[in-house]
Amino acid sequence: MNNNIYGIDFGTCNFKVFSKASGKFITEKNTIALINKNQMYAYGDEAYAMYEKAPESINVVFPLSSGVIADYNFLQMMIFEFIEKRMKGKTKNAEFLVAVPTDITDVEKRAFFELFYKSKSRPKNVMLCEKPLADAVGLGIDVNEPTGVMVVDMGADTIEISVISLGGLVLSDLMHFGSNRLDESIISYIRREFNLVIGKKTAMALKEQLGSGLPGRTETMVVVGLDV
């Protein structure tokens, strides 16, 4: 049996990889820092630490948008850097199971296949799995039971709501907004109410530390920004 298998979840914000052979699991920011426009300088959490702080010579980019590939070449480079250097894994003749959104087009699916098949690793097999099913299995749910289970996946650019039963999707709806929209709303509100420009990282900190789905919270937080 081949144990050289990797499970991969490409999120707009976070990137997750699991190695069956070693049992290692990593999750880092899906971010790349570039110099000279096309040379990878850093990736993952290291690149994200430069976001909104880097000089003009360093461009920090996010290679996925709304769950689909926005920058093919750099995403391909990053995935194999992660596996081979961070996880000390072997990619040649490996198998890859990739979680993808349910509503992507055939062209977008082909891009995920080519991400691996057109790489130097020459994989043995590449399989795509619909994200709601991967989420349910990861939560320990028996997806083959004749019981409807609702799975809600809230991401940076999308929110996917699905019902699973008997090993398949009964229905699924993908909405093209997510936590990034909340960050943008917080940035707009702070600017409108206080004439203060804050960055996305500050907005995320406000959301994560003070945000609540219920009224009545009274905590406060000091933030720093540009007075306009």
Residue ranges and their predicted role:
Residues 1-154, 164-228:
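Nucleotide/phosphate-binding catalytic cleft detector across ATP-hydrolyzing
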